[in-house]
């Protein structure tokens, strides 16, 4: 690839590890038991790699410092979390061959939460950083957000580099495509039961599962909070799942069958997490160009549904 390639998983299968040691530069283990299982394979990896360099091994840490509110499903520091080694479970006697430490505890957060997390990490694990080559502080950093505390981040990185002999890594995955992508839907029907309900050709369960899992309310072009404007509707889907509801929105004008509604900030996770529950079609993928023209990149049909079975 010509670039560094890092990988983490809560556990690895042996057949996967045999390939990973050939193509990954950093391999991070979720437990010392997993590290012990593949320690020799990592140590001998230079023999099977094109660059003739052994992989750099890391251990994922759980600093047990929750900074998230409202979406526990994305909190690796929550109760009984399986992700990362706690201070109680840390094995200093097994650190031979370990070159890095890793934590990933944030989700769509600012730099002040990263500082809080690092301080908790440093208090429990800082003494081991002097023996490491790198520190990976994971993802969840909204560094492209308008109000992101960039100076706070810079100050923290400078402190780490001046205090410990480590290279610092960040993984701002979502931030790279923040507020990008649209999901264009059509109103198929309008029914009434306590309130007006729009039946869309899109689905929270199939096309934006984070709406139900996180949960969260996706931004909608020309849509407002329920009750804020004159016309309020519940947006739902064509599946048989009663709870397949995207949310309640209000509009300045009444919505009619055949209208298009456009959800925003849909690039993140939309393709990797979608599914065909109930036979719901996958949304086509189109490219909106700067001149306003649209290029259809990929469309999906029955064969795609069939081949996933």
Predicted regions and their residues:
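Conserved, mostly hydrophobic/aromatic
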Residues: 20, 59, 101, 137, ...
């Amino acid at each position: 690839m010509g670039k560094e390639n890092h990988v983490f998983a809560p556990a690895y299968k042996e057949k996967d590890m045999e390939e990973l040691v050939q193509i990954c530069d950093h391999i991070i283990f979720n437990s010392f038991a997993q590290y012990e299982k593949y320690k020799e394979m990592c140590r001998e990896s230079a023999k099977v790699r094109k660059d003739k360099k052994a992989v750099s091994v890391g251990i994922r840490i759980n600093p047990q410092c929750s900074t998230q509110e409202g979406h526990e499903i994305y909190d690796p520091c929550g109760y009984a979390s399986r992700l990362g080694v706690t201070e109680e479970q840390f094995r200093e006697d097994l650190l031979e061959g370990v070159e890095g430490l890793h934590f990933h505890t944030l989700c769509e957060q600012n730099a002040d939460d990263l500082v809080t997390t690092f301080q908790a990490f440093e208090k429990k694990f800082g003494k081991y950083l002097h023996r490491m080559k790198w520190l990976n502080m994971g993802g969840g950093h909204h560094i492209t957000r308008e109000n992101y505390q960039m100076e706070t981040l810079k100050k923290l990185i400078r402190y780490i580099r001046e205090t410990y002999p480590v290279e610092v890594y960040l993984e701002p995955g979502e931030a790279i495509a923040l507020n990008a992508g649209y999901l264009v839907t059509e109103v198929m029907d309008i029914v009434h039961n306590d309130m007006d309900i729009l039946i869309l050709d899109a689905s929270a369960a199939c096309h934006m599962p984070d709406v139900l899992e996180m949960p969260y309310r996706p931004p909608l072009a020309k849509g407002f909070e329920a009750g804020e404007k004159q016309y309020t509707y519940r947006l739902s889907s064509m599946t048989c799942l009663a709870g397949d509801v995207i949310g309640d929105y209000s509009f300045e004008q009444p919505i009619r069958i055949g209208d298009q509604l456009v959800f925003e900030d849909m690039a993140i996770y939309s393709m990797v997490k979608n599914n065909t529950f109930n036979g719901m079609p996958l949304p086509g993928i189109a490219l909106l160009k700067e001149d306003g023209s649209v290029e259809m990149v990929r469309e999906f049909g029955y064969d795609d549904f069939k081949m996933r079975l």
